[in-house]
Amino acid sequence: MGNRLLVFGVLLIIGIVLSVVWMFFAPRHVMYMSLLLYRQGDADRYLEELDSLSSRLFFNKKLRTLMAIDANLIKGDKEQLNKLFERAAAYKLSSSDRVLVLQKELLFRIAQEENEKAVESYDAIHKAYDKLTDKQKEKYTEIIKEVEYPYTIHVMRDGKYASELMERGDTITDPVPAGVCYLRAAQSYCLKDDQDRAERALNHAAKKLKDTTYFQEIQKLIQTKNYKGVLKYKI
């Protein structure tokens, strides 16, 4: 009996030590990995780290699968993304996590011009959204909007959000998100065959995106008056 109590006591001490270590190192590890991917854009190093022993200790297999999605989106690894989305679909996730995963899958399907799968993802994300609490729905409203715009433009081929996107671009202070709104507005006006407003939206987009890789291409579209060329951007 005494030996059992001693063993239990030792295990309890080890458990406490491990929990303290985990609480100290896990947040630091998450921060380090976030810097790798979202600040440095080093998707390969991030994925190597995600497969390391420390990551396997801190994150379970399901979480590592979900964490790998963003890195592979940056890499543009279509084959790997198809596998990851298939695995994610089989996992039991909260409705909020399901919305986040489906948002990424929907944007991926749109970029790949896989319209049938995009429709499936769109329907699924709304079903997951409907299961959220009212408070959660408020939090995820912007996420739904962010998939609604490209879905309407590239899958439905409808320019109905043109004016709304221009207004959003006017109110957003961060230049890149504002530029994306103007770019989407230009796409929407092209779908409405409104060349004048498409040109105006493209000029606004160029000003906001002057420090990005889009700038030169947008300028070329404006100079050649090839406004419908903006529809190639699946953003």
Identify the residue ranges that each predicted region occupies.
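N-terminal signal-anchor transmembrane alpha helix of single-pass membrane proteins
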Residues: M1-M33
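N-terminal topogenic membrane-targeting module
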Residues: W22-L102, Q112-N115, S121
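The tetratricopeptide repeat
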Residues: H29, R64, V101, K139-V147, ...
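Alpha-helical repeat scaffolds
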Residues: D44-L53, K78-A90, E114-L132, R157-I172, ...
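Boundary/linker segments of alpha-helical solenoid repeat arrays
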Residues: F58-K62, L93-L100, A128-K139, T173-G179, ...
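Long, non-transmembrane cytosolic or organellar matrix-exposed soluble domains/tails
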Residues: L165-I235
